[in-house]
Structure formats: C-alpha cells, structure tokens
Amino acid sequence: MVLQYNARYNPVPAKEFLFMAEKKVDHSCTLDKIISLCKRRGFVYQASEIYGGQAGAWDYGPLGVDFKRNIQNEWWHYMTQLRDDVVGLDSAIFQHHKTWEASGHVAHFSDPMIDCTECKARFRADQLIEDFVSSHPETNPGKPVDTMTHEEMKAFIDANINCPTCGSKNRKYTAVREFNLMFKTYQGPVADDSHLIYLRPETCQGIFTDFKNIVQSNRMKIPFGVAQVGKSFRNEIIFKNFIFRTCEFEQMEMEYFCKPGTDDGIFEEWRKYRWAFYLKYGIAEKNLQWHHHDKLAHYAKDAYDIQYNFPIGFEEIEGIHNRTDFDLSQHTKTSGKDMNYIDQEDGNKSYTPYVIETSAGLNRNFLAFLCEAYEEQNVGTDGKEDYRTVLHLHPRLAPITVAVLPLMKKDGLAEKAQEIRTMLKEDFVTDYDQSGTVGKRYRRQDEVGTPYCITVDYETIHETKEDGSPNPDFGTVTLRFRDSMKQERVKISELRGFIHNAIANYKPVVR
C-alpha cells in the first residue's frame, strides 16, 4: 500500500517521511528501504523537516547532489558531446506569459480532479482509478483510464471507490473537473494581467522560442537538436511515492528539429538511442518497457514512454514524442515572428520543422538508478546468513568513486592514506574513513555505492619484512572491488591509470 498525501487536509508528521511503502520481511528492494537509505546516508532529506516538512518537496543531501549531478553529466555527455548534431541551451525559468498561451498550457495543461464532499480531500481522478484497479483488477473499467471522459470517471469512482482519506463508504464526490497545473504569479509590484507570469511547467518552450537565434548564431542545419537540463514546476493535486511525483523537479530534454516527412524514421532512431542509454548505465532490460499512448497530447502525432519497474510497479521515467510542427507554428501565430527554416540544401525551400522530443525526468532517473542498484546480498559462509546492503551503481554515476582507508590510525598509515587521497582527488571523487574495522568501513562504502576501496596497510609503507628481506608489496595498496568484493594489490604509482581502466571497462551487474 502506498500512502497518499493531501497538503491541505493531512498535516505532515514531524519526524516521518511522507510516503512509506508497506514493510516486507524479505530482502528485496522496497520503496521504504530506499527512503530510509536516502535519509540515513545523505542522499535525500524531507524539505523543512524541522517545521514538520513541506509536502512534495525534498532536499538532496551531500551524496544525493553528487549522484544527481553525475546522472545529469552522463546524460549531457551522451546527448551532446558524443554527437555532432546536438547543441545545448539554458533558458530562463520565467518566460513571457504569451509563451504558455501559444503552447497550449493555459488552455490544456490540467489534470482531472475530484473531491470527497465529506472530508474535502482532493484527488486526481485518473490516478484514483488506476490505483484502485491495480489492487482490484476484477473492477477493470474496460478501457484505458486516459481515454475515459469526466462522466465515465465519476461513474466508476461512485460505483467502486471509498474515499482513501476518510474511508467513507457513502462515496459522495464532486463532479470531475480540470485543474490547471501551472503556478502563476505577478512580476513586479502590480498584480494585473499585464504582469502575469508563470513558473515554467516544462523546459522545452524556451528551446522553441530560441529556435531562430540558435539557427542564426550557430549556423545550424537541419536536422539538429537542442538539449537542456533545468527545473520545472507543476502544481500537482497529489504528491506520492517519495521523489517520483513532486511540484518542483528537473527535466533533461532534447528537441530535435527535422524536415517534415523524415520525422517517423527519426522518431524511431531516438527511441532506440534513448533505450540504449539506460542499458549502458546499468538498468536491466527486463526492468524496462515501452508504453504507447492511446490518447495523445494536443501537440503530439505519436508518443511513447520508457517505463521502469519500480517497487510500486512500472512507471514513466522518460517520454519520446513526435510534436510535429505544433510548437513552432503556434509561436509564429502568437508572436507574429516567422519561425520557418530556409533549407539551402533543398533549393532554399521554406518550411516549419517537425520536432522529435526526448524528455527524461532527472529525479525519476535518480530513483530508478537507486532502485536498480539496490541489493541486500547474502555474503555469509558456512551456511550462516550475513547480508550486506550494496548499491551496484555504475562508477560514472556513483557519488563517491574511491574511498581511501588506512588499516590503522597510527604508525604513519593515516598520513600515507591522506597522501594517496590527495593524489587521486584531481581525477576522482574520493572519501576518507579511518573509523572502525576495515570490514565495517567496506560495508559503509558498499551501502552508498562506492565502486573502489583502497586500503593502506603496513605492506604499503615498509620496504623490508620483519626478517630483513625485501618486501615485494612495498609501495602497493589493496584495491577492493565493490561488486565482487575481490581484492588486488596495485602499485601506488599505477593507481590512477588502473582505476580509469576499471571504470572504462565496467560491466553492470546482472541479477
């Protein structure tokens, strides 16, 4: 069972996370385990926790901010630096309010909302039905929820669903109506329509309004793409499932401009390219699936979601859409500015480009990669159970790449370990830990996904053995691998290259 939170009628418990999944006795990955790990190890905290928490808002801690930035950096590398046809942009969060009129957000960007008339709790009608049907499959409405009319949603809810908040069996609900998801405010001291402004609900519109600037300043030729990572804001009716659905989130989007008639083939190419990204960074193919939209958005010709198998089931982590020429045509119409492209390679033909969009949620990627990496692994011997919690994160995503551990704090081992850490800092994100046994320190690093641990011991610093003979391991350290727990002696002088090579040749764990 996943608890739902209503900001108005359900105060946040002072010392609790909001959305804890039901605990299980086995060693599988559950949402409550991920939430617990995130807080305990500094990945994610509840925002404003000392004041009871802010609904749908989360802070990314010391490890979380590096993990999230690594995902973003790898996405950027994969989408722009490995390609010759994609450039970057960082557009403003605040855009002219007519931008959102042209895009259709003012008229169409809404979710179906329904209220319980007894406790006044509000719900997204479509999600209320989906959650109910997932636990009561025999009540399937017989058609996809996203194709149901408001009247059909209302009838199904009245006939089947007791209020999740107050538990009332009377099923007294309001009519289903649309709730616009944009946050709006006013810029400056005057609160009138001429100063109306919105927090952007998606990053892509800044790309469309800058289309002509990018073409002219960078001499871009179609086909080409523009990538962007940034924050977006949606006034969600319901927040649930930890960081999966929140009001403030980050998107990693790319808009690919192409000649009309070539869009279908390019659409399929981007579907394959984006699918391969998740496989490359460690998501098992069995945990991914495509979802084809039965009901398309007002701007779309075709749309697929990449869904990941979270502990809560398959949910979207990225959408790939054929937006046709809708956005550029709408901005031409609303602004009066010509957004056509002059194709010099096609006899100076003028046309409005079609757009293929890839839109990934950075926060949802964060959660998906965590869930995929999480394992409670039995490493016991002689028939005894001994479980370690380990995150099998790809080394390029892990918040810490290398931990340096002195065997003891004394006899110059700590100083040598710090010297080695300093040497590695230029190349890798490092950690230093000298508290507790080496075994316990390994476990701490496993739990946060550190792929490599270096142990500095007496063999490292002693040129000779106790009998006076040469020590062949002088100037070496023990390098321990997270996934296999195997250990290898490596020369200090070769550490940088050895670790770089290990990262370059890393193979995701298959489970």
Language-model region placement:
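NTP/phosphate- and nucleic-acid-binding module
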Residues: 13-511
